[in-house]
Every structure is written in C-alpha cells, then in structure tokens.
Regions:
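Hydrophobic ligand-binding cavity/cleft-lining segments
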Residues: 2-68
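Short Gly/Pro-enriched turn/cap motifs at secondary-structure boundaries
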Residues: 25, 77-79, 104-106
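Intrinsic-disorder/low-complexity, polar/charged segments enriched in Ser/Thr/Lys/Arg/Asp/Glu/Gln
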Residues: 28-36, 73-75, 84, 97, ...
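Generic structural detector for well-ordered beta-strands
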Residues: 34-38, 77, 88, 116-118
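Hydrophobic pocket/interface hotspot
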Residues: 43-48, 54, 76, 89, ...
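Short beta-edge strand/loop motif at the mouth of beta-sheet-based domains
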Residues: 52-86, 95-97
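Beta-strand/loop substructures that line and gate deep hydrophobic ligand-binding cavities in soluble
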Residues: 88-90, 101-162, 166, 170-172
Length: 172
C-alpha cells in the first residue's frame, strides 16, 4: 500500500511538472526549414498546390477532401493517422509563395504554413515557415520537448524530396 502511494505521488508529480512547464512555455512559436530541389519552382509549386493528390506522395495522409465554399476560397481537409484537420488557402502566388492556415478552432493548436519557392542556380529552394500557437499546455510541452516544433515541416519536405526522387535533408 505504501509503495502504491509513493508510485502515485511520483506519477502525479511528473504530470504536474509537465503541465507547469507547458504553461510556462510561450504559446507562439516560429519554425522554419528549407531544402533545394533540382526542379523548377513552378513544378514544385504545382505539386504542393495539388492538395487532393498529396496522399500519393505523403505517407502521413490517408486522403484529402476538398471542401466546397460559397465564397470561392480554397478549403481542404487532410485525413491522417491522428484525425482530420481543415485548412484554408489564404495566399496563393503561383510558383512564388503560398500560405495555408489551420481552420479548425478546437485542436489545441493553430497557425499557418508559409511556403516560399525561390529559384536557385541548380533548382529551387523550398522553405516552409510555421507560425504556430499552441493553447493546450500538454501539447505545448510535447511539441517543444518530445516531437520538436519543426518535425512536421521536416517530414513534409523529406516526402516532397522523395516525390521528385531526391534524398534531402531539411536545414534551418
């Protein structure tokens, strides 16, 4: 009985520490990674912009659903291993820049991804910058100390490289 109480006290202390540390971390963060692909900016942009085809090259997606809107803006829902997330396309400059924003309000996190496509001598620099906000203190702790705030960007860029037959290593 005494051992069980000690174990319970340790577990509760760990949970309390995780929540306290999460609460002390800033809600907002910015993370950015980039790669160079030996393709044109237009070709890469077309691949990234074709949201419904993303499951053919992103293993984290089961399907993407394009959502009809009344005001002609682009909205889509990605269905992955951890559920569904709805996004809005908020800026679209073909071959140059694209911004998507999480449209769901109840996830415990929100933010934008800004895609920049810059022509280089040997191809195109693809940079993704995440401006995120994590309201859930547990998610905040996990994203900072367990997953890493740039891990989703890195996985995305690696998958994009593989789509074009290139082995890439995302850099800050």
């Amino acid at each position: 009985m005494k051992l069980a109480l000690i174990i319970l006290a340790i577990v509760l202390t760990i949970i309390a520490l995780v929540l306290i540390i999460g609460a002390l971390l800033p809600r907002s963060h910015v993370a950015s990674r980039q790669i160079i692909l030996h393709r044109s900016a237009e070709e890469i942009y077309q691949t990234v912009r074709d949201f419904s085809a993303a499951p053919t090259w992103r293993s984290d997606l089961k399907r993407v659903e394009m959502i009809p809107t009344t005001d002609n803006h682009i909205q889509f829902r990605e269905h992955g291993r951890h559920g569904a997330i709805t996004y809005d396309l908020v800026e679209d400059q073909p071959g140059v820049r694209m911004v998507t924003r999480i449209a769901d309000l109840n996830l415990g996190y929100s933010g934008t991804w800004t895609f920049a496509f810059t022509k280089e001598a040997t191809g195109t620099r693809v940079q993704i910058t995440e401006a995120g906000e994590v309201s859930n203190v547990l998610f905040r702790f996990m994203s900072r100390f367990v997953f890493g705030q740039s891990s989703t960007i890195e996985k995305y860029l690696i998958a994009l490289g593989k789509k074009f037959g290139e082995d890439v290593s995302p850099q800050p």
